[in-house]
A protein has these predicted regions:
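Active-site-proximal beta-strand/loop segments in catalytic clefts of secreted hydrolases
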Residues: 60, 82-83, 106-109, 125, ...
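Active-site HxH/HxHxD metal-binding segment of metal-dependent hydrolases
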Residues: 86-185, 222, 267, 271-284
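Metallo-beta-lactamase
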Residues: 32-44, 48-51, 77, 84-85, 127-194, 200, ...
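C-terminal motif of bacterial Sec signal peptides marking the signal peptidase cleavage site
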Residues: 9-11
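Accessory terminal helices/loops
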Residues: 15-37, 242-317
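Sec-dependent signal peptide recognition
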Residues: 1-5
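Conserved beta-strand hairpin/beta-sheet module of binuclear metal-dependent hydrolase folds
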Residues: 41-95, 205-221
Length: 317
């Protein structure tokens, strides 16, 4: 996954200090100090209360800085993603709620499904990519870059196992297809599922209309947005970000899946404008060394890392 280049891109973004050699050298993001932290019995996870009945569960000691979300209803709780699988997440979830927990994933990439195996009630997109993860997980050789000193601070793991790290297979309660008006009722609050392919074929976002909350998965976050995987589709991505931007006037808080757990709804409109500047050729790529496989386009609050071949295909259609 071009890991060395991506680590450099992450390091050189405005969100972190310049060019880290070891992830342990990186401080926590200063913006986190403005949020309400919830104490938990875990060194690996940092938990913040970010909305009414909403907890952000961060993994800041791996360079992915992935964020899972626990959404509390009256009758059940919804866990949106389960993280890297580097440390069991269920003990932390059990400290936050006694309600039955249902898991749904923003998409099938390994950094969002790592803890799925810990839960009995996982509902999943009915896609080939997700079904492959269910059956096989992800082998160590595909994720070993996540446990190098450049990518992780092992000091915070209970039982570090760099040689054995892999994403485990998991069981699902049922698969769901793309449909309109798909709601996840939690008791006292209904969460709408939005289908937002592009970053991956099976991407979803969640929308809590009553509270004005929008969870964007990897379709948007304030950092380098990766658009280079074999399942990335730029045409679909453009349509998906327009769907999210159309909700910006109704949304009070945006909850992305990486780096910082709270973003402003106005960023969604900026996202569409920025992407259009990229594909039109108005925005020039910044230099990323000698690697021509990907191009990086920087904006004030985020950037795009796009496989050059995909971008050329989009521009030439």
């Amino acid at each position: 996954m071009l890991l060395a280049l991506l680590l450099l891109m992450t390091a050189c973004s405005t969100e972190k200090k310049s060019e880290p050699q070891l992830w342990c050298d990186q401080p926590l993001r200063p913006e986190l100090a403005q949020l309400e932290e919830v104490p938990v019995d875990s060194k690996w996870f940092k938990v913040y209360r970010v909305g009414e009945g909403v907890y952000a569960i961060l993994e800041p000691y791996n360079f992915q800085e992935v964020i899972s979300y626990l959404i509390i209803g009256e009758n059940k709780a919804l866990l949106f993603d389960t993280g890297m699988g580097l440390e069991p997440i269920s003990p932390t979830i059990n400290q936050l709620t006694d309600l039955p927990v249902m898991v749904v994933n923003s998409h099938s990439h390994y950094d969002h499904i790592g803890g799925n195996y810990e839960f009995d009630n996982v509902i999943a997109r009915n896609t080939l990519a997700m079904k492959e993860r269910v059956r096989q997980g992800v082998a160590h050789d595909q994720v070993r870059g996540e446990v190098t000193p450049e990518a992780i601070c092992l000091d915070y793991l209970t039982n570090p196992d760099t040689a054995g790290y892999a994403i485990k297979p998991f069981k699902t309660s049922y698969y769901f297809n793309e449909m309109s008006d798909f709601l996840l009722p939690l008791g006292g609050r209904d969460i709408q599922v939005l289908f937002v392919p592009g970053h991956s074929p099976d991407g979803i976002a969640l929308y809590d209309e009553d509270n004005g909350y929008l969870w964007t998965g990897d379709t948007f976050y304030e950092a380098p947005i990766w658009l280079f995987d074999k399942g990335t589709n730029l045409v679909a991505y453009r349509k998906s970000i327009e769907v999210l931007a159309a909700l910006s006037a109704k949304v009070d808080k945006v909850f992305p899946a990486h780096n910082l757990p709270v973003s402003s709804p106005e960023r969604l409109n900026e996202l569409v404008t920025a992407f259009d500047q990229v594909v039109s050729g108005e925005k020039e790529a910044v230099k990323t060394g000698d690697n021509a496989e990907v191009s990086k386009f920087e904006f004030e609050h985020f950037s795009f890392v796009i496989r050059s071949q995909l971008l050329e295909g989009f521009q030439n259609q």
